[in-house]
Amino acid sequence: MAKRVQVVLNEDVLSLGRDGDMVEVAPGYARNFLLPYGKAVPVTPAVMKQVEHRRAKEAERQAALKQEALAFRTALDTIGRFTVKKQTGDDDVLFGTVTNGDVAEVIEEATKKEVDRRDITVPDIHRTGNYKVSVKLHSEVTAEINLEVVSY
């Protein structure tokens, strides 16, 4: 039975784990790859203390980001309705569609805060009217906004 060594990862390693994880690996893997390339360090009490400190700071940072996302969701709720103007043809059918990029621009104009278009989920919109759009602000915070599509 081969002896295993414990190391703490300094960065994400695809087959092992994420930054800060303590993992057991074969001694040769640690000695020949992880340690020389700076991807891991051997486990010592000092390293464990650093890992705990880093995890606490990361938890604080995540809590602050969540609070910021909650405040932004409240701001979006107070605005109420966002309006997108699109060119239409007969029977209020849009030329094209409303994309998540269009919604991101409208939110940015109204709030002066940038929202990544990839975090916006827009239903298929091909007509004028009112729609519900989902905006992911944080991994645990999602806002539902009212989107009004009008012709110009």
Swiss-Prot record:
**Annotated family:** Belongs to the bacterial ribosomal protein bL9 family.
Which organism is the protein's source? Synechococcus sp. (strain WH7803)
- What GO terms are given for molecular function? rRNA binding; structural constituent of ribosome
Is Transmembrane there in the keyword field?
A: no
Any one GO BP annotation for this protein: translation
Q: Tell me if Membrane is a UniProt keyword of this record.
A: no
Q: Please name the gene that encodes this protein.
A: rplI
Which keywords does this chain's UniProt record carry?
A: Ribonucleoprotein, Ribosomal protein, RNA-binding, rRNA-binding
Protein name, entry field: Large ribosomal subunit protein bL9
Q: What does the record give as the function of this protein? A: Binds to the 23S rRNA.
Q: Which GO terms describe its cellular component?
A: ribonucleoprotein complex; ribosome
